[in-house]
């Protein structure tokens, strides 16, 4: 009975995913970060425009996303590539 109870507790913790575990890209090269508490969104947003027509982007965890036509705001792991 104790084994069953312990198993249920472990399964509950895993299913509830206690704590903040959202992972976001934080660089163009693919570096990732576990987001701090309170930042539950991943974002990729345009910060400048190069003369050849390419955008420079910033990648980060955030609590509120920037608005813009080329920006990505999402809430699942590694969704801001």
UniProtKB/Swiss-Prot annotation:
Alphabetic keyword roster: Acetylcholine receptor inhibiting toxin, Disulfide bond, Ion channel impairing toxin, Neurotoxin, Postsynaptic neurotoxin, Secreted, Signal, Toxin
Signal sequence residues: 1-21
Modification after translation (UniProt): Contains 4 disulfide bonds.
Subcellular localization: Secreted
Tissue expr: Expressed by the venom gland.
GO cellular component: extracellular space
GO molecular function: acetylcholine receptor inhibitor activity; ion channel regulator activity; toxin activity
Disulfide bond entries: 24-42, 35-61, 65-73, 74-79
Superkingdom assignment: Eukaryota
Cited Gene3D superfamilies: CD59
Name the record gives this protein: Mipartoxin-1
Origin species: Micrurus mipartitus
